[in-house]
Amino acid sequence: MSNKVKSDIEIASKAEILPVTTIAEHLGLDADALELYGKYKAKLSYDTIHSLKDKEPGKLVLVTAINPTPAGEGKSTVTVGLGDALSKKDKKTVIALREPSLGPTMGIKGGATGGGYAQVIPMEDINLHFTGDFHAITAANNALSAFIDNHMQQGNDLEIDGRRIVWKRVVDLNDRALRKVVVGLGGPIQGVPREDGFDITVASEIMAIICLASDLKDLKKRLSEIVIGYNYKKEPITVGEMGYEGALTLLLKDALKPNLVQTLEHTPAIVHGGPFANIAHGCNSVSATSTALRLGDYVVTEAGFGADLGAEKFLDIKVPALGKAPDCVVIVATIRALKMHGGALKTELSEENVDALAKGFTNLQKHTESIQTFGIPYVVAINKFITDSDAEVAKLEALCEEHGIPFSLTEVWEKGGDGGLELADKVIAAVESGAADYKRIYDDAWSMEEKLEAIVTKVYGGIGVELSSKAQKQIVEFKKYGWDRYPICMAKTQYSLSDDPTLLGRPTDFVIHIREFIPKLGAGFVVALTGDVMTMPGLPKKPAALNMDVDENGNAQGLF
């Protein structure tokens, strides 16, 4: 390879890409199993998905991470690279990833299909409109908003209280100006004026529903259970009471089908869904993972942000819906993130600082302990960056050895699957050991307070929970409706184990502050809001979009 550092899109644009029908053949599927979106993308048909249901599932590997820096730690890159490495080890491997959101792509990320020589392709298609899943979800979400406003305009038989509508409109962009809006202005024929707002599409409950629904029947049932707001008696109103679950299911019937693409090294990749990892559960769809498990001997998937958010939700929310727990967990750690947790300034993360690295190591330790709480073996993937010094790498390896933490120095960004062969060996050994003995950290029958305590004490390392007066009243209300039986989906900062984004490393003696709960009954969980969690991001001063363009031949530029 050239010593010149190439951008992701430069690498992807020069890659040999096989017809998606050829990728399907690797999985034992013929062309009739696919619904083609051009030569290189396809959806798997419902007939195909149904035909696989009785097959024995393969082995599942979950990739998570330590608490990240704002730029991320390369979790998707390691997921792709590990998948390619397992393929090189003659394991029939399928990767299951989330779809990127246009908002972060145009904002700060510039793309989210892995990086370097560990990417999913066609990367520009996946990063932009792909097969239209997010647009369908946006349309369904906003159709529901239109149905709500129309119901109020046309007599309001359900006595919807416009002040207590909790359903928001969405758009798949970072647009802070839309966080709070007023709709229905302009006189009686324009609708009933009320306050409204926009979330980003990946924060929509419909996104979470798509990612947890097992089939069309389950999708329709979940859509009917969405709480859109409350009536004048403060009683909840659902989509089912309004009668629109059928129309919403119709809008989403194709979006529920998983998408098949490939990596740079032609490992099959099923890329589908993409809920926020802070406000929702942050995992790709149950349909995608379940299908992948029946097509491959090994499936590598990821969960959003760090193990405190993404992995906990994968294990406590997605696994019960999937019916299959991971056989091994890979925890991605980077030297730059550990230095940040050890007190190094964000502007100095590229500079050698062995002392900060050693101090920040406690963050990694906590995440390894949390995964062990779930009874699953793990391997730490040290995702090597070109700015890491030899002294820093040696120090981190020594710390892992000293504390009995299994690890592998991983260089998939630079070397593709070849850079993850040792990691693949250690993952295979962990999987084949049969050591996985999965257990959730709480039971659905527990009280909401008990579930919160379990997450905070066992996963975050805190000492307890403090409920606002609003949250306390909501718990009483939720018990009345039976909503306390749902799993808890914590909405908190990804940067810290606590709810304070400035409290880095491994904080102790902290309390998690719950300000309110949001029932997401269609998704099947209750969101617990901590701190200031944003459901509609804003753009940075210099968005990644400033560097994006397209040449006269239609080739994308600036995605990275």
From Swiss-Prot:
Gene Ontology BP annotations: tetrahydrofolate interconversion
EC class: ligase
Alphabetic keyword roster: ATP-binding, Ligase, Nucleotide-binding, One-carbon metabolism
Reactions this protein catalyses: (6S)-5,6,7,8-tetrahydrofolate + formate + ATP = (6R)-10-formyltetrahydrofolate + ADP + phosphate
A GO molecular-function descriptor: formate-tetrahydrofolate ligase activity
Record flagged with keyword ATP-binding: yes
Superkingdom: Bacteria
Entry's transmembrane regions: none
CDD domains for this protein: FTHFS (cd00477)
Pathway(s) it belongs to: One-carbon metabolism; tetrahydrofolate interconversion
InterPro entries (alphabetical): Formate_THF_ligase, Formate_THF_ligase_CS, P-loop_NTPase
Family: Belongs to the formate--tetrahydrofolate ligase family.
Protein name listed in UniProt: Formate--tetrahydrofolate ligase
Gene: fhs
